[in-house]
């Protein structure tokens, strides 16, 4: 909220994107073992944040749903062609993500907003 307030004070609009599914991802930071691994409990946090992003309480000026990136056969995961590790997008995934961005996202904020 504080970052959004600072941005708004400078005339910058804030857009939030839906946090994409990440089932299948495991991070092994610095070879110390699996320090982050997908679980239903962690995924519930993603869903909770996505719900907040869409709520009236969220300070964002816009919300970008990314549902088409989810695997229709496993909505907790990305489309297999869009990722190799479960979270980072392949070039095909990046193109699909870019196609979901609204054209007006880069328009300057007007005084009425």
Residue ranges, per PLM feature:
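Catalytic His-Asp segment of secreted/periplasmic serine-dependent ester chemistry enzymes
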Residues: 20-113
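Structural beta-sheet core signal
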Residues: 16-18
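Surface-exposed amphipathic alpha-helices with a cationic face
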Residues: 1-8
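A short helix->loop->beta-strand "cap" motif at the edges of active sites that frequently abuts
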Residues: 9-14
């Amino acid at each position: 909220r504080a970052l959004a307030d600072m941005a708004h004070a400078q005339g910058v609009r804030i857009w939030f994107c839906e946090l994409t599914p990440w089932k299948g991802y495991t991070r092994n930071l610095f070879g110390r073992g699996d320090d982050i691994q997908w679980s239903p409990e962690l995924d519930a946090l993603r869903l909770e944040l996505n719900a907040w992003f869409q709520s009236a309480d969220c300070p964002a000026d816009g919300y970008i749903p990314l549902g088409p990136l989810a695997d229709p056969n496993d909505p907790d995961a990305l489309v297999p062609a869009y990722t190799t590790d479960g979270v980072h997008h392949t070039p095909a995934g990046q193109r699909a993500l870019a196609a979901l961005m609204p054209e007006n996202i880069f328009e300057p904020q007007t005084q009425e907003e």
